[in-house]
Amino acid sequence: MSHNTFGHLFRVTTFGESHGVALGCVVDGCPPGLALEAEDIQAELDRRKPGQSRFTTQRREPDQVKILSGVFSDDRTGGRQLTTGTPIALMIENTDQRSKDYSEIRDSYRPGHADFTYDAKYGIRDYRGGGRSSARETAARVAAGAVARKVIPGITIRAALVQMGPHAIDRANWDWEQVGQNPFFCPDAKAAALYETYLDAIRKDGSSVGAVIEVVAEGVPPGLGAPIYGKLDADLAAAMMSINAVKGVEIGDGFAAAALRGEDNADEMRAGNDGRPRFLANHAGGILGGISSGEPVVVRFAVKPTSSILTPRQSVNRDGAEIDLITKGRHDPCVGIRAVPVAEAMMACVLADHTLRHRGQNGERP
Amino acid sequence: MSHNTFGHLFRVTTFGESHGVALGCVVDGCPPGLALEAEDIQAELDRRKPGQSRFTTQRREPDQVKILSGVFSDDRTGGRQLTTGTPIALMIENTDQRSKDYSEIRDSYRPGHADFTYDAKYGIRDYRGGGRSSARETAARVAAGAVARKVIPGITIRAALVQMGPHAIDRANWDWEQVGQNPFFCPDAKAAALYETYLDAIRKDGSSVGAVIEVVAEGVPPGLGAPIYGKLDADLAAAMMSINAVKGVEIGDGFAAAALRGEDNADEMRAGNDGRPRFLANHAGGILGGISSGEPVVVRFAVKPTSSILTPRQSVNRDGAEIDLITKGRHDPCVGIRAVPVAEAMMACVLADHTLRHRGQNGERP
Amino acid sequence: MSHNTFGHLFRVTTFGESHGVALGCVVDGCPPGLALEAEDIQAELDRRKPGQSRFTTQRREPDQVKILSGVFSDDRTGGRQLTTGTPIALMIENTDQRSKDYSEIRDSYRPGHADFTYDAKYGIRDYRGGGRSSARETAARVAAGAVARKVIPGITIRAALVQMGPHAIDRANWDWEQVGQNPFFCPDAKAAALYETYLDAIRKDGSSVGAVIEVVAEGVPPGLGAPIYGKLDADLAAAMMSINAVKGVEIGDGFAAAALRGEDNADEMRAGNDGRPRFLANHAGGILGGISSGEPVVVRFAVKPTSSILTPRQSVNRDGAEIDLITKGRHDPCVGIRAVPVAEAMMACVLADHTLRHRGQNGERP
Amino acid sequence: MSHNTFGHLFRVTTFGESHGVALGCVVDGCPPGLALEAEDIQAELDRRKPGQSRFTTQRREPDQVKILSGVFSDDRTGGRQLTTGTPIALMIENTDQRSKDYSEIRDSYRPGHADFTYDAKYGIRDYRGGGRSSARETAARVAAGAVARKVIPGITIRAALVQMGPHAIDRANWDWEQVGQNPFFCPDAKAAALYETYLDAIRKDGSSVGAVIEVVAEGVPPGLGAPIYGKLDADLAAAMMSINAVKGVEIGDGFAAAALRGEDNADEMRAGNDGRPRFLANHAGGILGGISSGEPVVVRFAVKPTSSILTPRQSVNRDGAEIDLITKGRHDPCVGIRAVPVAEAMMACVLADHTLRHRGQNGERP
């Protein structure tokens, strides 16, 4: 991962600011011959789109994606639009930028935001809506992820919100069907009901709250991952940590593994039907030695509470003067919610990349 | 990060297997003119060296480093050996490889180890001592880290073990001086005393236990980090996750941030003496928007229990037959202990790399 | 250089096909605070634009560039638009695509073109106007080059056509002023007059002809270049060879150096005024050991004749049947002409990249 | 290509100075399961080894390679040593360094050498035998090339010297068998006889002379190459230009193509037996649009005369004082000779890399 590009053979370069002309990405290295329509990408973008419930920002962006390059159709493709192996550029024009008065955030450093650090690094900053540091950039990732999914049709990637504030779900209630049926991408219907009340109160307070997201990839063949410094878990950790507001990433049992003894942590094996081991547990989260084991790849990450809140906080401005600050504007009370489709996209990109890398160096996948 | 290389301008490529001829690394991109003696590197290696207490593997390796290239001294350097800007190759020859009977691990897949996944990926595996997947590779990282520290002389990097099994230290007792005075790199003298008894029991049981390590970098100037996909925290997450047996990484408050409300998580600011903000808290762990804030960079990571234990576990062998397995040999009952100097090395490498990157694209550091 | 991205700290990713929706690039790693208007880029694009004389393709493309991201202006910038250090996306929409009948090139492999090889590699091909393999892609390079020039304001980069077909210019007549005054970018007025007659005849024959271009960068400080595999000349060779139809690249005396004896090839030195050597000759073309010497960097490259000609050539079609083929459509009789501004752009990008890399690893430039 | 690493999936990182402890490389990304013995590598190194005739430097280096990692053998491999997919570190210890008086080159800038530019870049320089800028580094490339050849067993790579000073060979006399039978790697026996007399005279004069080398790869399948910025010819151009003293690179007809008309340059096609086109000519040198066509890949490059000569040349020293300088020591009168096996190695590495990249992104090779 480097600057605004990630991936090695399946490479994604994103661009764009929150209130600029457009944002988007170039997906380079996508194999040729895959069916890809704008609608495939739009469907994923719509899941992430703001303004779909009262629990996400009220900014209204259609987030309409345009494919600028890298696909082709003619009579020989039977009318289907196929990837050609050349770079796929995707663009989403910004429409609802509200060219309002930005003087407040122009001069002030909002606590928890990247205002001060961008100024410290670059000496200049597009402060409108957070500029490049806005979570709006993740729309480009979701678009890229939709392409990545085409590369790995045998792999199912799903994510869910498993904790909001201090309230974890009851894993016994886990039902993937539920994820699409509440505004929180929550797999536990009971927890979702609780979150509704809880987040309404947070929202009315002008406050915000953190969350934990879990991403699961099923159908990952054993053998993906490039030890030592392109380990599958290392790449996933970087991918998830690069999402806005993420402060922690764990694989399988994660931090809980530290408290275990070796006997309890070992994923025992029995003979499987297909000639490969059947694991009796998955503490490892599907990755051993940086390489996938064939078990579901399980990643969790923590999102901090949205930094924009209505309670006044102490801060300073660009001139070093001390100020008290509240952050007006349209914001997500729990930015973790919209991180759910973003997490799926990052998982898809990493797995697509490692699939191509494995095939390149080790021949076909097992 | 890609395959066996990490870093962008300060680049480290490691090589070597646990029981091969030698292991080491090539450090590419180190600035010229830095004083570097083998002793500087050796001092760091000695901290990681096995066999220093009864709590780490009894393998006896002197881990003597040789500098093969990239340094120079003559009368004009006043006898000091200086880096020249060319690649610095470092080699550590293996001596205590015990060419014993490996038939057991040759054919069996040890639970929790990378035996099956390396076979699945490569179809062949140097099983002696774990081969490339052995934590012995981290000696090369520690050597590279010693070079990295030369690049960032104003930054102090220290790590400590803050949890062993279920037993966290009492942070009120934190004393960096203690870290060098017990075999656990533990900053809490009282906890260290407890660990001694606790780990002795684990060791005698032939069992093992996990740990949590915390790494802190002080004196990091604001402005380091390359958004969006080379964020400082994303690179640190990948760096730590690439260490053997690590299952989780967090920055600042990490997973605890998920349970906070926005008011509690915001690091408020007041005017500082040096013209930059003084932060009243550091929930963010020194990183905002992927860029360092000037506050201490704080990273924690979880290490799973050593997978090699004496309790029989169910497994399969290469031929798919079911077996019961115990893992004999010399092992660390808590592999997290020796991860402490490794974590410092990875932090040093990442910060050296980002220092050079920032200087390249944004001019001098603030 | 890798896939559709080149550069290391100053990185350019291009996208787009000849007859697709749009083409463009993302310039990543551009330092912040540089004044950049669309007009700056447009001026360079206009030099490369087709249809400006009867000697280039009659395709009419306004080649209007849009800056989608990475720049910012407000009252604090005094109305000037500045780069922000974030990725600069540039887009040029295709307008004159002539959705005509492509059935001929759809099924046939035009000799000298990339039709067969793209099919062999990808199994699918956007054949309209050559798709991704069209020289139209170089518009994106020229746009990126305009940004690169901002990074290296002290360096003057100029290119010229120095040979058309078998007719080399007379170097004694070299006058940079002439380059802008004839449709060939030719620095020798007399040769330009000859080329007019010569190329008219070629054009009327439905034939085409090759060319040699020379690019010169003056004001390059000594010290740029990253030995061993990022040598300045190696990067320039790759950059120029990546331009469509280029078949050879040389630095300084180039191939002529093979015929020299050591005494004649050595660039002798005398004391310079500024404390650095003054070179008495520049056979080396400004690069020694892969590092700039402070002398002008001189690169020449050969462009093959345009492959699209009206004389029938033997070929085969996709089905393997033998055919005779002429290539109708709008084409440049000497594609080398429009390679002149492209060459300047590539030189600018490589020098900008190496300037940042040098600054990163070696501190400020000498 | 970046710093001291080249390649993307098949990656080579070299290290070492002319008179340092050792030089070598790490080959990363080599597929597993390939038979590789030190003898395979040694055989290639012996072809490049100095001191084999009076026409190359009299330095006596056994250039004995050691494989430090990345290979494995046991009873299951039938005693054969196989690659394991992990990094292959290769080391050649320096033995004949002659720790003589270097005071002359320590303080002086030898014309044509990298002395001044390394000082300008790094401010410090290992001047012993040229340090990192010595052609001794190419031993590491030859070693890596021997590994690369294992990756592409169906491809035959051969190089030859085709011009020495002003004397080109007669291509009608081309006989690959001759290449191993004269000290010049010359395929024309008659030219070789001439070179013997010619180079003897050059040598006795204390002078030197340039050369042109041609490298040919046969059996390259169509489809290798990664447009736009990882084109096969662009990568080859960088690879060859990175060899010491190279000043020009061309593919196929190269610079001669500039003088051709389109009709003469087009490589016509007829139906082939294997379903792919049979080309009637190969002006393109086996590459169209940056992708291999299945025809032999033909690359030529020019090597300047060795800069170390016994005729005094004007120069300056580190302090800026003007001096006259001759370069004593052991040198090659025609450094192009030993570039022949180096060129083969670079071709092998580039083709191995592109073979893996193609397989990764486009499935199996045609």
UniProtKB/Swiss-Prot annotation, chains A, B, C, D:
InterPro entries recorded: Chorismate_synth (IPR000453), Chorismate_synth_AroC_sf (IPR035904), Chorismate_synthase_CS (IPR020541)
E.C. number: 4.2.3.5
Coiled-coil parts of chain: none
GO BP of this protein: amino acid biosynthetic process; aromatic amino acid family biosynthetic process; chorismate biosynthetic process
Domain of life: Bacteria
Binding-site list for NADP(+): 48, 54
Alphabetical list of CDD domains matching this protein: Chorismate_synthase
Molecular function, one GO term: FMN binding
Keywords: Amino-acid biosynthesis, Aromatic amino acid biosynthesis, FAD, Flavoprotein, FMN, Lyase, NADP
Subunit structure: Homotetramer.
Role, per record: This reaction introduces a second double bond into the aromatic ring system.
UniProt family annotation: Belongs to the chorismate synthase family.
Protein name, per record: Chorismate synthase
Species this chain originates from: Methylorubrum extorquens (strain CM4 / NCIMB 13688)
